[in-house]
Amino acid sequence: MAKTSAIERNLKRARLAKRYAAKREQLKAIARNQELPVEERFAAQLKLAELPRNSAVTRIRNRCEITGRPRAFYRKFRMSRIAMRDYASQGMIPGMVKSSW
């Protein structure tokens, strides 16, 4: 099990990213627009830099929903390989069966 503080920190980052997503996209669009004057684009870049660092989507780490493990993460199930193996062996993941040939 991962540290509770690490899990909570990641959840806080996800909430911040969701809250600032629209503003961040708007500022990025202005900064990338080549038709606007350089001063306006630079001002948008400065405003973007003033936003909280943890509001960037790249700061969010994919973690297992059950254990909080950050590595060996399967996006489709939002679980780590260990939790997925346990749940699959108990038959708790629909359609997943142990392979046999």
From Swiss-Prot:
GO biological process, one term: translation
Functional note: Binds 16S rRNA, required for the assembly of 30S particles and may also be responsible for determining the conformation of the 16S rRNA at the A site.
Quaternary organization: Part of the 30S ribosomal subunit. Contacts proteins S3 and S10.
Pfam family, one: Ribosomal_S14
Protein name, per record: Small ribosomal subunit protein uS14
Gene3D superfamilies per UniProt: 1.10.287.1480
Domain of life where this protein originates: Bacteria
Chain's gene name: rpsN
Molecular functions per Gene Ontology: rRNA binding; structural constituent of ribosome
A GO cellular component annotation in the UniProt record: small ribosomal subunit
Record keywords, A-Z: Ribonucleoprotein, Ribosomal protein, RNA-binding, rRNA-binding
Family, as annotated: Belongs to the universal ribosomal protein uS14 family.
InterPro entries: Ribosomal_uS14, Ribosomal_uS14_bac/plastid, Ribosomal_uS14_CS
Signal peptide: none
